[in-house]
Amino acid sequence: MNENCYKRVVIKLGTSLLTGGTGKLDHERMADLCRQIAELTRLGTEIVIVSSGAIAAGRSKMGIRHIPKDVPFKQVLAAIGQSQLMNYYDQLFSPHGLTVAQGLLTKSDLSDRSGYLNARNTLLALMELGIITIVNENDVVAIDEIQQAKFGDNDNLSAMVANLIEADLLLILTNIRGLYTSDPTLHPEATLITEVKEITEELEQLAAGSSNKLGTGGMVTKLEAARLATSSGVTAIIADGHIPDIILKLANGENEGTRFIPSLHKPDSRQRWMMSGLCTRGSICVDDGAAKALRENQKSLLAAGVQQAEGKFGRGDIVKLTDSHGKRLGYGITNYSSDDISKIKGLHSQELNAVLGGNQGPEVIHRNNLVVI
């Protein structure tokens, strides 16, 4: 390999890949992955790793064979296992002359703009020094992640990190080749989907039918991660980490796994922060007409298109936008509080004054303060 197509890469290493299905870390597999990453760094690629495996490492250290369901017990194992995991990575990268750093994040770390920028600046500084940063969600305090909440898995965390550092490529490596037309463990005739230009409802249904017993993230969360990454202008690939030299092949542009094509629009820093969805105070559900106008034409959201507001938020807060089916449309800065929106939803712009005794303009969310995913 003489040249790589991507200059800044986030690599997510899943539990199923790192354990090989045994529940214990596979040191040979980890050594080979680290070798590939080291070779890529020698070619000038900046790399951040989002690594699962802390709880698995803790189980192995303590000789615990069963998968715990109790949250405090999982947190204990994560605390024990995280140091083991970092020690393994340090030992594996040291022969290649590389230093590793640990980055433990929680959603609250990135939920405000200053925290987001501080984390970004730290990661960029580490990359500039040639350090391999190993990122994980802080399982010891991140209750949502331990409980396998939808937004707290390492798949989505890897997409957030790719968003954060403006990566060119997000590699989600697991024990399956990519997204299939049906679950290949149940349907041998299933075929690999090699390229995705748009994440449709049909693809989401395919992902929901797949299975993964070891990690917190199945194919559904990988698809969610791919959506965030591509909306942020990042190419995302889901691939089998067992394929020989898979990291080097994908970084060189070879066709393996399922490749998700990024949006042509490259969002700016503020838009990327909004896209992360970490700073939302509530949500606004819109009707089908408004959803179409937002998706296809990037129009401002008017009160007439609003069906309801959920949560408690004020003017100037960032909210999530959903369609009438609950599907996420994007994020925006609202001109009206949740209380005011409950009064003006469905109304035409000329009716707002009479209801509120004054208004903040016809737009509930102006298109300049809106990002569509």
Curated annotation (Swiss-Prot):
<comment type="similarity">
    <text>Belongs to the glutamate 5-kinase family.</text>
</comment>
<keyword id="KW-0547">Nucleotide-binding</keyword>
<protein>
    <recommendedName>
        <fullName>Glutamate 5-kinase</fullName>
        <ecNumber>2.7.2.11</ecNumber>
    </recommendedName>
</protein>
<dbReference type="InterPro" id="IPR036393">
    <property type="entry name" value="AceGlu_kinase-like_sf"/>
</dbReference>
<dbReference type="GO" id="GO:0004349">
    <property type="term" value="F:glutamate 5-kinase activity"/>
</dbReference>
<feature type="binding site">
    <location>
        <position position="52"/>
    </location>
    <ligand>
        <name>substrate</name>
    </ligand>
</feature>
<dbReference type="InterPro" id="IPR011529">
    <property type="entry name" value="Glu_5kinase"/>
</dbReference>
<dbReference type="Pfam" id="PF00696">
    <property type="entry name" value="AA_kinase"/>
</dbReference>
<keyword id="KW-0028">Amino-acid biosynthesis</keyword>
<dbReference type="GO" id="GO:0003723">
    <property type="term" value="F:RNA binding"/>
</dbReference>
<dbReference type="GO" id="GO:0055129">
    <property type="term" value="P:L-proline biosynthetic process"/>
</dbReference>
<dbReference type="InterPro" id="IPR001048">
    <property type="entry name" value="Asp/Glu/Uridylate_kinase"/>
</dbReference>
<feature type="binding site">
    <location>
        <position position="154"/>
    </location>
    <ligand>
        <name>substrate</name>
    </ligand>
</feature>
<dbReference type="Pfam" id="PF01472">
    <property type="entry name" value="PUA"/>
</dbReference>
<feature type="binding site">
    <location>
        <position position="12"/>
    </location>
    <ligand>
        <name>ATP</name>
    </ligand>
</feature>
<dbReference type="GO" id="GO:0005829">
    <property type="term" value="C:cytosol"/>
</dbReference>
<dbReference type="InterPro" id="IPR019797">
    <property type="entry name" value="Glutamate_5-kinase_CS"/>
</dbReference>
<dbReference type="InterPro" id="IPR005715">
    <property type="entry name" value="Glu_5kinase/COase_Synthase"/>
</dbReference>
<keyword id="KW-0418">Kinase</keyword>
<feature type="binding site">
    <location>
        <position position="139"/>
    </location>
    <ligand>
        <name>substrate</name>
    </ligand>
</feature>
<dbReference type="InterPro" id="IPR001057">
    <property type="entry name" value="Glu/AcGlu_kinase"/>
</dbReference>
<dbReference type="InterPro" id="IPR002478">
    <property type="entry name" value="PUA"/>
</dbReference>
<comment type="function">
    <text>Catalyzes the transfer of a phosphate group to glutamate to form L-glutamate 5-phosphate.</text>
</comment>
<keyword id="KW-0808">Transferase</keyword>
<keyword id="KW-0963">Cytoplasm</keyword>
<dbReference type="InterPro" id="IPR015947">
    <property type="entry name" value="PUA-like_sf"/>
</dbReference>
<feature type="domain" description="PUA">
    <location>
        <begin position="281"/>
        <end position="359"/>
    </location>
</feature>
<dbReference type="GO" id="GO:0005524">
    <property type="term" value="F:ATP binding"/>
</dbReference>
<keyword id="KW-0067">ATP-binding</keyword>
<feature type="binding site">
    <location>
        <begin position="216"/>
        <end position="222"/>
    </location>
    <ligand>
        <name>ATP</name>
    </ligand>
</feature>
<keyword id="KW-0641">Proline biosynthesis</keyword>
<dbReference type="InterPro" id="IPR036974">
    <property type="entry name" value="PUA_sf"/>
</dbReference>
<dbReference type="InterPro" id="IPR041739">
    <property type="entry name" value="G5K_ProB"/>
</dbReference>
<comment type="pathway">
    <text>Amino-acid biosynthesis; L-proline biosynthesis; L-glutamate 5-semialdehyde from L-glutamate: step 1/2.</text>
</comment>
